[in-house]
Amino acid sequence: VLHEREIVTLIGPNGAGKSTLIKVLLGIVHPNIGEIKTTKPLKFSYVPQKFNPSHSLPLRVKDLLALEKCDPVIKQEIIHDTGISKLENSKVQQLSGGERQRVLLARALLRQPDILVLDEPMQGLDIQSEAELYDYVRSLPAKYGCAVLTVSHDLQWVMQGTHRVVCLNKHICCSG
């Protein structure tokens, strides 16, 4: 169960089913058993663990953001809040890991999701970028009214940034 404005983190060893569960939630694959039940239709946004666009497809940050239609005022607020204002004319392929994560997070937020799914959002970030992203992600449920579902191996995030943890190992081992 995932509640509105809640941050839940999935943890577990490699092969535990974290990515599969995300794919089921996003509708990419169908579950072998069981089903996903919701009280209303939900809008998801997903930030992948890795995003490496081809160098043969020159894509600027503003072009990537333009793929998602959004109120211009909300768009500018998200661009400001994620700290990517100065990156809008940059090519996505040339961004650092932290910059790319912030751009992907901004794009996901432009959808105004009910549930924001972040797959290892801190991976590859320097300590400063990680701390800034932690703080920002913690603010998202209150600011945008969305639930946040993360996959993480970062125990600091699990202990400090999460309302609830779900431990997987081919099934839900525990939750709390």
Predicted regions and their residues:
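Helix-to-loop junction immediately C-terminal to a conserved catalytic motif
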Residues: 26
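Conserved ABC ATPase signature
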Residues: 91-95, 99
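Conserved ABC ATPase "signature" region
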Residues: 72-88
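H-loop (His-switch) and adjacent beta-strand-loop-beta switch element
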Residues: 165-176
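H-loop/switch region of ABC-family ATPase nucleotide-binding domains
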Residues: 152-153
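Catalytic Walker B motif of ABC-type/P-loop ATPase nucleotide-binding domains
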Residues: 116-120
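Hydrophobic anchor residue at the start of the ABC signature
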Residues: 105
